[in-house]
Amino acid sequence: MKRAILIVLDGVGIGELPDAFKYNDEGSNTLVNTAKVVGGLNLPNMGKMGLSNIEEIPGIPKEEDPIALYGKMAEASPGKDSTTGHWEIAGLILEKPFPVYPNGFPKEIIEAFEKAIGRKVIGNKPASGTEIIKELGEYHMKTGYPIVYTSADSVFQIAAHEDVIPVEELYRMCEIARAMLQGDHAVARVIARPFAGSPGNFYRTPRRRDFSLPPFKPTLLDYLKQNDYDVIGVGKIEDLFAGKGLTSSFHQENNTEGINNIFKAWEKLREGLIFVNLVDFDMLYGHRNDPQGMTRALKEFDDALPDVMGLLSDFDLLIITADHGNDPTTPSTDHSREYVPLLVYSPNFKRTFSLGIRKTFSDLGKTLAEFFEVENDLCGESFLNEIEKGWKGS
């Protein structure tokens, strides 16, 4: 019986990539910089796995004898968004980045969208989601015009107050936008951003929904599903892969619920993969430049790790990584172009060591494909032989 849990800590990077300067991300290091600002991180369980052996993190001692294999992965695809990162983890490397709109969307797109939904829109610029509802929320409530905005990522976001545009209607607008945004304007994600509250006290509700492009070729998820493995998505995995390759999904409103869903998914798993995204690190703390919140979220996850590890039998795998960085200590409120940590744990490891710096996130997808013994056409280089060395102790 082959089983694996793959957990993506959304936005939890571990140092700038060599090309970070192209993205204005020099100096970004989500984990290390957060630790410096808060006076050190207390993450004993990830510490035991070798987190500080990847790069020394204030507050987390290096382990002489870590319980996991450890390393870091570089992103080969251009970009630094969740879709690009998750697709690359699952074995797809993008040759060109998804389109971005630093000056807002072209007039022809906005006019076509307005015609299709029968309403004017407001905004049409890059913005922080919390800031733009502060700025335009009251006007939106008076007019009923949805707020369209983007970010440094390839996203077309639509914000609407739940009392003005019901959530189901907002989702319908997103489906219209998704159908329109193809070809040269094929953004990675259209995102519904419902909010509530009153002027001066607006807040985003948990009913966000992503409408992603489907992957352009089969991913690890598809190959596993085709071979009758369970592929269970937890969190926004279903959204990021447009539902492709999954046998079932669990959604959640926060990391606490997401961690609980790992246990629910495990009860359902016969043989196969649980693919988890925990988004609070990114959504609540990275984008809002809140290193204290990031610290609390990391501690909550770390506290849950022993129970997650306790699920595993001898040759099961638990893998912890990220999809990009989102350094809460920099002036930017956007994602950062960073290496991501790689921690690989199995209860039966007799020896552990460094996996080094992987050239692409796809090494992880390729490794899991080989672990599950499925023929595939994925990018990347498998390191299953290293995992097997850990089991053999050789």
Curated annotation (Swiss-Prot):
GO terms for cellular component: cytosol. It is an enzyme of class 5 (isomerase). Mn(2+) 1 binds at D10, D323, H324. It catalyses: 2-deoxy-alpha-D-ribose 1-phosphate = 2-deoxy-D-ribose 5-phosphate; alpha-D-ribose 1-phosphate = D-ribose 5-phosphate. SUPFAM superfamilies: Alkaline phosphatase-like, DeoB insert domain-like. It comes from the Bacteria. Its cofactor is Mn(2+). Pathway: Carbohydrate degradation; 2-deoxy-D-ribose 1-phosphate degradation; D-glyceraldehyde 3-phosphate and acetaldehyde from 2-deoxy-alpha-D-ribose 1-phosphate: step 1/2. Its main location: cytoplasm. Keywords: Cytoplasm, Isomerase, Manganese, Metal-binding. It is found in: Cytoplasm. One of its GO terms (molecular function) is magnesium ion binding. Binds 2 manganese ions. Belongs to the phosphopentomutase family. PANTHER family: PHOSPHOPENTOMUTASE. Isomerase that catalyzes the conversion of deoxy-ribose 1-phosphate (dRib-1-P) and ribose 1-phosphate (Rib-1-P) to deoxy-ribose 5-phosphate (dRib-5-P) and ribose 5-phosphate (Rib-5-P), respectively. This is Phosphopentomutase. It comes from Dictyoglomus turgidum (strain DSM 6724 / Z-1310). The gene is deoB.
